[in-house]
């Protein structure tokens, strides 16, 4: 039988449990805040990430190619110079590495990834941000764009990926504490934007865990009294769809997860 990991908050300390987790004061507890944006959601279901469309996951551990649509994103350029990737290896263990960019020419990662959860610009030239769109992907790279795209950093000054998806690492259980969603549109045509919170346990298919319907300009903040529990290696993502083929929504979503080491992994 698996041992339960005890949280310090059970003895009534005055500092909030969530703050203690963020400060690294509770052993075997980690936190993650994932957020994304999709500015072109129409009447087909899309993942909330800047590339648009439904996200396609890597089916096997792979070396990724990191490149940019701009020649200025290079080691001595005015744009982004280095990026850090965060993901999971073929055994679903957390990994990360820093890559020095070479403009539109792809640079291979040293590590192999089964999941890419985040990518951040760590250093840049005088522009202070990436000049083009930075990609992490596989396949043939044409003018900086790989055939298969798994992460992007758009040239909007964010300096990191905006992708509302995450995978629970091996040996951990994830607890979704809260999620938020907001939207907007320039259309005057009445329409509803539907948010879908979905998850895929390993070896299964994506299943809806919550659904919210929003009209234009709405913001929903949903704090869960009882968190949603996700087993190791579960893919979690936020998706959206418009009720009208003539109304496109700009939608953002975020979720907070605390993930705890499984007792039998100690």
Where in this protein do the model-derived segments appear?
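Beta-strand-centric surfaces of beta-sandwich/beta-rich domains
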Residues: 2-115, 122-266
């Amino acid at each position: 039988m698996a041992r339960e990991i005890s949280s310090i908050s059970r003895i009534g300390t005055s500092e909030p449990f969530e703050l203690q987790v963020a400060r690294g004061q509770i052993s075997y507890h980690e936190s993650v805040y994932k957020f994304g944006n999709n500015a072109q959601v129409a009447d087909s279901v899309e993942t909330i990430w800047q590339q648009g469309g439904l996200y396609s996951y890597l089916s096997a551990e792979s070396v990724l190619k990191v490149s940019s649509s701009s020649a200025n994103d290079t080691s001595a350029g005015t744009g982004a110079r280095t990026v850090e990737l965060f993901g999971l290896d073929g055994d679903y263990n957390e990994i990360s590495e820093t890559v020095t960019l070479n403009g539109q020419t792809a640079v291979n990662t040293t590590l192999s990834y089964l999941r890419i959860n985040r990518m951040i610009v760590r250093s840049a030239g005088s522009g202070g941000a990436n000049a083009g769109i930075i990609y992490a992907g596989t396949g043939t790279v044409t003018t900086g764009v790989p055939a298969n795209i798994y992460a992007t950093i758009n040239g909007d000054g964010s300096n990191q990926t905006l992708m509302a998806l995450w995978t629970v690492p091996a040996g951990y259980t994830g607890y979704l504490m809260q999620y938020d969603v907001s939207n907007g549109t320039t259309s005057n045509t009445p329409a509803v934007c539907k948010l879908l919170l979905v998850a895929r346990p390993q070896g299964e298919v994506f299943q809806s865990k919550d659904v919210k319907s929003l009209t234009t300009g709405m913001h929903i903040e949903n704090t869960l009294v009882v968190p949603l529990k996700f087993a190791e290696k579960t893919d979690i993502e936020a998706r959206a769809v418009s009720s009208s083929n003539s109304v496109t929504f700009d939608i953002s979503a975020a979720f907070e997860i605390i993930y705890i080491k499984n007792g039998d992994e100690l």
